[in-house]
Amino acid sequence: MAFASLIERQRIRLLLALLFGACGTLAFSPYDVWPAAIISLMGLQALTFNRRPLQSAAIGFCWGFGLFGSGINWVYVSIATFGGMPGPVNIFLVVLLAAYLSLYTGLFAGVLSRLWPKTTWLRVAIAAPALWQVTEFLRGWVLTGFPWLQFGYSQIDGPLKGLAPIMGVEAINFLLMMVSGLLALALVKRNWRPLVVAVVLFALPFPLRYIQWFTPQPEKTIQVSMVQGDIPQSLKWDGDQLLNTLKIYYNATAPLMGKSSLIIWPESAITDLEINQQPFLKALDGELRDKGSSLVTGIVDARLNKQNRYDTYNTIITLGKGAPYSYESADRYNKNHLVPFGEFVPLESILRPLAPFFDLPMSSFSRGPYIQPPLSLNGIQLTAAICYEIILGEQVRDNFRPDTDYLLTISNDAWFGKSIGPWQHFQMARMRALELARPLLRSTNNGITAVIGPQGEIQAMIPQFTREVLTTNVTPTTGLTPYARTGNWPLWVLTALFGFAAVLMSLRARKH
């Protein structure tokens, strides 16, 4: 009785919401405790039972603050190290980001309790998953979006991973919310029926993991080398270090020419404008072609636009076997989805003078097109994504082609030091390989550099914070997963059906 009385207090529920939210961080890499996702979502649903809408919204906000406060506090590393602002301001900015993201979980909980106030199957199994899909979409879209810490990623090695090639990671989010709600209902109502349904729903997708949606092409196996330069972020954009950086990458690459078919350098490995490096690029291109190798590298490009101003791009270019390198070559990729404050500054004229954090090196990039052709290197087709873009499943899928041999992502996570951020980023990259059934080549400045197999498994990787080269044989695959064919459309149809049914059944219940 004492516990029951205690749990009814709103303050206790707010505290528990913080704890359940923080627990959710354990579901993601590097911890990879996937049951924590279910426990965290169970807590969110159970704590909002029998609460007024504003009370539920507060619980949802606190739950989100626990999740994002613990799960994305790694942004503090870059702000504190490179932001040039006092410590309290750095902490405030991290808290502000966590609070902003928590608005969406607060919105979910508040609307759920407003429209479906009764603790029923309708609320937990039909309304909650549909509403969660909508609020998670908003979190990934409003103000360019930040779809980090979606619980579907926790299943990259879990029982539900077989759902990803069929309907994508967001479908796993949907099912996790449904299962968690049913478990919460079973616990609160002390009823075994929701428990049985939850177990059945959770078990049904398990056999899907054994379906192979791809066909390996062993005759097209190539040796790939990815150079991890481990250039400190504090030195990366120092002009005096440019020559040394080029030497590091060239010296690591020279022994690989003629041995590895494909050599990959990470995001902005060449820390200079492409136009300034024409002699170096043409000489390197000639050497690569003479020895029969191809190279992909990140670089910065600036092009004169129609307004007679320069647009600066975060770019991938190709060198080596095939047609000679040309600055006018269309075989390049320009990053489309830019990171706020890292690659562009909103309200630039106001914010840039305020603090160094708003005036970081290379924070005035322009966007490339949303859809871009694959990179083509001597018959190898690469669907590319730079850094943050790899977490955008729908965008990667929209750029994917049936003849894609590999997914490619290059990144620089040196901004975030030894935090958990790079591991979360890596986990999300693995999901793209699973969704599209293609090997993924991930080349980074200081880790995590790895080759991911077409089922999301880690085939090869090298340690973080080392100057090293990952060399391994990689076999491309062919075939289209259902998700590659349809994207998120089936899930949105399901969301619409669930939402319509939930509203209709709620209206009928109120009439009676």
From Swiss-Prot:
| Cellular component per GO, a single term | plasma membrane
Q: Which residues lie on this side of the membrane: Periplasmic?
A: 29-33, 78-90, 145-167, 215-486
Entry's InterPro entries? Apolipo_AcylTrfase (IPR004563), C-N_Hydrolase (IPR003010), C-N_Hydrolase_sf (IPR036526), LNT_N (IPR045378)
What superkingdom heads the lineage? Bacteria
List the stretches on the Cytoplasmic face of the membrane: 1-11, 51-56, 112-123, 189-193, 508-512
Record flagged with keyword Transferase: yes
Q: Name one GO biological process term.
A: lipoprotein biosynthetic process
Q: What is its EC number?
A: 2.3.1.269
Q: According to its UniProt entry, what is the function of this protein?
A: Catalyzes the phospholipid dependent N-acylation of the N-terminal cysteine of apolipoprotein, the last step in lipoprotein maturation. Utilizes a two-step reaction via a ping-pong mechanism. Lnt undergoes covalent modification in the presence of phospholipids, resulting in a thioester acyl-enzyme intermediate. It then transfers the acyl chain to the amine group of the N-terminal diacylglyceryl-modified cysteine of apolipoprotein, leading to the formation of mature triacylated lipoprotein.
- This protein's name: Apolipoprotein N-acyltransferase
Its encoding gene is what? lnt
